[in-house]
From Swiss-Prot:
Keyword terms of this UniProt record: Membrane, Receptor, Transmembrane, Transmembrane helix
ATP-binding recorded as keyword: no
Cytoplasmic-side positions: 1-52, 102-120, 181-200
Protein species of origin: Homo sapiens
Name of the gene this protein is made from: MS4A5
Protein name: Membrane-spanning 4-domains subfamily A member 5
Tissue: Expressed at high level in the testis. Detected also in the pancreas, heart and in the brain.
Regions crossing the membrane: 53-73, 81-101, 121-141, 160-180
Localization, UniProt: Membrane
Cross-referenced InterPro entries: CD20-like, MS4A
Effect the entry attributes to changing residue 123 to R: In a colorectal cancer sample; somatic mutation
Ranges facing Extracellular side: 74-80, 142-159
Amino acid sequence: MDSSTAHSPVFLVFPPEITASEYESTELSATTFSTQSPLQKLFARKMKILGTIQILFGIMTFSFGVIFLFTLLKPYPRFPFIFLSGYPFWGSVLFINSGAFLIAVKRKTTETLIILSRIMNFLSALGAIAGIILLTFGFILDQNYICGYSHQNSQCKAVTVLFLGILITLMTFSIIELFISLPFSILGCHSEDCDCEQCC
């Protein structure tokens, strides 16, 4: 009989009050403790939705920039300030990219994607802050933009309301974008599948 087929007996010694039958059907269970805060868990669950919102806001911001492109008509000698700053274009690029990275991180969580997503959301938050500041200057500088050059008072008020409505909508998009991208750039891990100590 060679040593590979030899069986060595195992003896279990239990105290009198414990019997082996109690432990035969025991199931092992593990308790995990999450290091994520409730806010992190909420954002991790809603990542695809928030990423989609960022992309939609980026597309809408770009669309308003295209609308401003057609405002250089007589009698207006210049573009609105917000168009001259370029915010509808570079802001929309930041919003679309940060939203795309959030969706990518939710689909496949890798350390590189998490880092890139945090960087893009940080840049998007900075872009949203810059956009809020530029839009505030736009309200101040261009509040009489339409009526200051047009002599036809009937069209002046209606177009001014439309122009200010677009600026208010852009301001709303920028504020919401700031509230979406800032937590993702600060809180660290985005996904429930991610080991936070590894990527934070």
